[in-house]
């Protein structure tokens, strides 16, 4: 086991974390919040430890599957601990375990929260919660691979360990280019959603945090009512992008290189959209008596189906009040997941 090189990778991870932690400081300054100092302190701690770990390149750069899994496992642990520091230092979530829970939920895009009143948090911490979704949605080590050739030709071991699916492959011969393409698509979709939300009348802060939470399919909301208080236009934009972020990014790559026929031949994509369509129609007609029209019922059904099948977790209604058939479909969709 090449522990020296693993520590080197963890060090770079902390350096990146230090940079990420500085972003909410901008939000804090914009709103005049003292919690911004918590991010500044956390950033300095992360960067100092990161610089210590990376001050000397290890001579032994051999890196195999076992090192890849260990690096990813340790990376997520270190990232979660350092990411929880702002909650603890600011005193807004003083309990260590609660702060860790909130941070881990963010990075893993689980979306579960210990907060009963989300709106009581400062803006910079609300931003950080959503930002952890965006960072974790694609995987921070994938982001690192797109910038740094850390493990030379053995980067694939990191990518395989980082990816949650049964298999992962290269989009192009160079793995670093693959990681760059993945993040470029991810960032582009996030930006498009952000712009559409702004056009719908959302505030700049709400649009950024909602786009981050949607992209990571995590669903950390900044309102206690989740998405219920927003307009139907906003809900539709978020619903569509939840579904789009659930699509295998390899399909988007095929569209980018002008191979739409090959992309549309994907059995995975057909099954994904087919399940969403059928579930939306069945639930929509099943709940139509609870809404003003069938179109509103279908819109609400589509939003909840998209939210559940992609495991995002945003909500616009209390679907626990829906008929048994609709609730059964919702539960089944939880186990299916997206592409």
Residue positions per predicted region:
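Membrane-proximal intracellular helices of multi-pass ion channels
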Residues: 1-339
